[in-house]
Structure formats: structure tokens, C-alpha cells
């Protein structure tokens, strides 16, 4: 199959790695890609992935049979819509359904209409409204940017002044949501949807805070592990019945079918499962730990979702064992990451058994060919093992071989798994 993958992160590298592992011999092009992706498949760095007309023209000209949209920005920009209008199978929701991630207010309304369990929330358009809502809920305070914020739009704090400052920062871009604090274990569950049917992948847990012990600011994610052996066997079915299917049905009823990856950000509380957030695409870094164990060919799931033929397909199968990923980030991430520094030692890191490297913010120097860090989250070290101890040992062994001045990573990923 000829497949176009839009995106340039470790998530997209993991998707491409899974597609290349199939026996089908897919012809894959990535746009814009990164240095690691460019070493595996052809890339089209000049394609404007936020321009639906440009992406559609490129897909038609090159005869792509499936387009996979990785990041949230092209989805919220509506890139999937012109592709669908031209009859090109695309994995990713259209602009309207992508508001499930693009607007926290929209997502809360959908949850309320569908009867999906979630925390109470108040939308605030002014600082005074935010302050009033903070006082209503009390500490710990939870404030979320209403729109896209690269995973950094949420603050959970005991400090009212910090919560108010966070609200003030994002009120310059739009509204914010002030929510009740939910206490429990967080779970990420991916579900493939064709607009009517959902099929679940393996649950994962990610680490959003920058520092060990869940300290420091929120990030796009510093690591993850899967499977979650501490979850009850009924967990996935309960999420399908109480969260995923009601949401998919509600969106279908509103003539905005959700076709793509429904990411359910969940928390298991003393009162049951609650939804923290929805995303409209594969999560990063959870994708890096979910896909390596996937036995069912990923392309069959993506194509079936894109063509409305998931019904009747068996649930995806996963190999035994565990997967752990640890993110290597640049100095001063997430505030002002230092970029342009050389990266070395990746071949040595990849030589550790059962380890792969998923590139994110990497590029080649056009003159010297040196590998450079170009952003905050630089790469993900992905390790498999029979046990989490095995996988963790391999991941951190590999990380110790990578050299990037000022780089940082958490040392406690999957330590309690």
C-alpha cells in the first residue's frame, strides 16, 4: 500500500516503524519527517502539512492509497476534510470532530450530552471568572487552556496565585477551563474508530511532569510504559461502554463522525473511571510503547477505520512482554529548549538488545551531516523486555550511551510498574 504519513515526531516515527515491520512491503512517504524518519523512508520536507489543499494535491499526484495524520495541528486545521471529499482514505478526524481535542469546552459539551463520566468544569473568559471558579473548587487547583497547547496547557497546583497566573497566560489566547481535581491513577487508552465502531489498543501510562517523582512543570510527556498489569480485566470494556461508544455515537448524531484515533485520557478514582481529556490522534510518548507489541498489522486497522469497515474485525492482538520508553529532552525544556546541539552515540544506544530509537526533534546539518537536536523533546528510547525490570534496564543502558550537551531525562519511568 502507498501510504503518506503527516508529522515529524517520535509518534510518527513509531507509526512508520510499525508499518515497515509488516510483510506487506508498503511504500511510505513522510511529510515533513525528521532525520530518523528520513533514514527509513522517503520524506517530503517542503509540503505544508497544515494546508489541506496542498496535501490533497500531493496525495492525488502521487497516488497515495492511505493518508495518516499524526499531529493534532493538521487535524484541527481540517486537513482531513478535502482528502475525504476527493475520496482518499484518511486516518484522522475532520475539522469538526477534531474539536474534541481542539476545544476543551467542546469536549465537555460532548461528554455532557453523551453522559460520559468526567469532572465538573467551569469555562472562564476573564481573570475574574477564573478566580471565582478557583475559589468554588478549592485546592488542588486545575486550570486548562481551552485550545491546543502542545501538552503544556494544564496546571495542577496547591498555589492559587500560580493557578491564576496560568489562567492569565492562556486567557490572552482564548478561554480557560477551571476543573475539579480528580485523584487517582491516570491511564491512556487508544481506540481506533471508523465513526461507528471502536477497537481498543493496549492501555498505557505516561509521565507528564518534567522531573522524577512527578515534580516540575507539565510537558508533552517524558516517558511511558505498557501494558498496565494493575488494571482490572474489565477496564477496557468499561471504557468502551461508558466513554468511547457514547462519545462516538454523540459525534455521529451531530453529523461529525469521528474517524481516526480516539485517545481517552482517563483517571481511575475511588468513584470510578473519569475522563480527564480527549485527544484526536495517537499520543506521544504512549504510541512508542503501544505499537511495538501490536501483532495485528497496523495498516489493516488504519485502512479499515479510514474506509468504514471496522465492524466485524477482531480486537487487535498484542504480544506478551512489556515496553518502556524514556524521552530525551534538550536543556531548558519545556520553557526555552536549547537547539542546534549535536547528538552522538545513537548507534551504540540502538545496539542494546530490544532497543529502538524514535526520533522527534532531529535534523542533519546540511554541511557536515552531523545529527542535531532541533527542539524540546529530541527522541524516545524504546525498550522491550519480558518484564518491566528488563525493559527499564535496557532503556537506561541505551540512554547512558547517548551524548547531547545539557540533555535531561527522567530516571523513574516505569519504576513502579
UniProtKB/Swiss-Prot annotation:
Keyword line: ATP-binding, Ligase, Magnesium, Manganese, Metal-binding, Nucleotide-binding, Purine biosynthesis
Instruction: Quote the catalytic activity from the record.
Output: 5-phospho-beta-D-ribosylamine + glycine + ATP = N(1)-(5-phospho-beta-D-ribosyl)glycinamide + ADP + phosphate + H(+)
User: Known PANTHER family for this protein?
Assistant: PHOSPHORIBOSYLAMINE--GLYCINE LIGASE, PHOSPHORIBOSYLAMINE--GLYCINE LIGASE, CHLOROPLASTIC
Top-level lineage group: Bacteria
What are this entry's molecular-function GO terms?
A: ATP binding; metal ion binding; phosphoribosylamine-glycine ligase activity
* Required cofactor names: Mg(2+); Mn(2+)
Positions binding Mg(2+) in this chain are 277, 279
Q: Tell me how the cofactor is bound.
A: Binds 1 Mg(2+) or Mn(2+) ion per subunit.
* Pfam families according to UniProt: GARS_A, GARS_C, GARS_N
- Organism, as annotated: Leifsonia xyli subsp. xyli (strain CTCB07)
Write the Enzyme Commission number(s) for this entry: 6.3.4.13
- Residues engaged in binding ATP: 134-188
**Name of the protein this chain belongs to:** Phosphoribosylamine--glycine ligase
Q: Which residues form the ATP-grasp domain?
A: 108-307
User: Which pathway does UniProt place it in?
Assistant: Purine metabolism; IMP biosynthesis via de novo pathway; N(1)-(5-phospho-D-ribosyl)glycinamide from 5-phospho-alpha-D-ribose 1-diphosphate: step 2/2
Amino acid at each position: 500500500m502507498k501510504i503518506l504519513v503527516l508529522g515529524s515526531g517520535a509518534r510518527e516515527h513509531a507509526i512508520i516503524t510499525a508499518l515497515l515491520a509488516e510483510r506487506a512491503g508498503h511504500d511510505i512517504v513522510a511529510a515533513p519527517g525528521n532525520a530518523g524518519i528520513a533514514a527509513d523512508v522517503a520524506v517530503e520536507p517542503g509540503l505544508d502539512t497544515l494546508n489541506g489543499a496542498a496535501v490533497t494535491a500531493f496525495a492525488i499526484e502521487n497516488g497515495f492509497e492511505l493518508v495518516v495524520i499524526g499531529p493534532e495541528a493538521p487535524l484541527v486545521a481540517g486537513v482531513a476534510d478535502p482528502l475525504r471529499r476527493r475520496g482518499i482514505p484518511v486516518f484522522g478526524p475532520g475539522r469538526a470532530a477534531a474539536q474534541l481535542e481542539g476545544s476543551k469546552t467542546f469536549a465537555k459539551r460532548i461528554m455532557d450530552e453523551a453522559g460520559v463520566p468526567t469532572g465538573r468544569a467551569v469555562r472562564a473568559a476573564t481573570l475574574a471568572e477564573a478566580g471565582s471558579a478557583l475559589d468554588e473548587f478549592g485546592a488542588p487547583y486545575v486550570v486548562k487552556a481551552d485550545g491546543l497547547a502542545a501538552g503544556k496547557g494544564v496546571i495542577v497546583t496547591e498555589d492559587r496565585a500560580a493557578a491564576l497566573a496560568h489562567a492569565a497566560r492562556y486567557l490572552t489566547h482564548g478561554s480557560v477551563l477551571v476543573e475539579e481535581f480528580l485523584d487517582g491513577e491516570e491511564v491512556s487508552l487508544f481506540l481506533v474508530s471508523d465513526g461507528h465502531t471502536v477497537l481498543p489498543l493496549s492501555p498505557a501510562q505516561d509521565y507528564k511532569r518534567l522531573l522524577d517523582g512527578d515534580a516540575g512543570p507539565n510537558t508533552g510527556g517524558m516517558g511511558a510504559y505498557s501494558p498496565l498489569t494493575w488494571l482490572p480485566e474489565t477496564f477496557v470494556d468499561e471504557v468502551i461502554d461508558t466513554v468511547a461508544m457514547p462519545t462516538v455515537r454523540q459525534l455521529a448524531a451531530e453529523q461529525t463522525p469521528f474517524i481516526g484515533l480516539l485517545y481517552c485520557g482517563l483517571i481511575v478514582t475511588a468513584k470510578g473511571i473519569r475522563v480527564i481529556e480527549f485527544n484526536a490522534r495517537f499520543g506521544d510518548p504512549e504510541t512508542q510503547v503501544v505499537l511495538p507489541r501490536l501483532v495485528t498489522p497496523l495498516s489493516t486497522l488504519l485502512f479499515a477505520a479510514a474506509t468504514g469497515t471496522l465492524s466485524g474485525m477482531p480486537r487487535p492482538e498484542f504480544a506478551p512482554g512489556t515496553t518502556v520508553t524514556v524521552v530525551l529532552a534538550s536543556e531548558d525544556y519545556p520553557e526555552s529548549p536549547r537547539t542546534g546541539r549535536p547528538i552522538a552515540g545513537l548507534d551504540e544506544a540502538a545496539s542494546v538488545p530490544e532497543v529502538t530509537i524514535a526520533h522527534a526533534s532531529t535534523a542533519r546539518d546540511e554541511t557536515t551531516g552531523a545529527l542535531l537536536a532541533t527542539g524540546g523533546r529530541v527522541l524516545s528510547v524504546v525498550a522491550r523486555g519480558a518484564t518491566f525490570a528488563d525493559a527499564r534496564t535496557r532503556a537506561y543502558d541505551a540512554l547512558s550511551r547517548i551524548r547531547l550537551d545539557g540533555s535531561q531525562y527522567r530516571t523513574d519511568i516505569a519504576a513502579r510498574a
